[in-house]
């Protein structure tokens, strides 16, 4: 966020948050297509975890998707993909877990929220 060197843990948190933010932006595009074409009860979104190489799919309704997007620090992940070092599990649903970034990762996620942050 600044040009000063970050403590190693803060740099790790930022790197993980930025990966999840990237997948959030992909899922925003999926939602826009779903809204444009409609017709399905559930849509396939990409797991928003920070695991390298994870492209697992999660089925959500648009209502569930909007529920997660209501908070700029929240993401949905496949159960077991949460990283307790940088996020808290706030809800467990059938087929996915909603996590919330905290600390520096939460700041990064909220600032990068395409819906304006909170």
Give the residues covered by each predicted segment.
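Polybasic/polar functional segments that serve as interface/processing modules
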Residues: 2-118
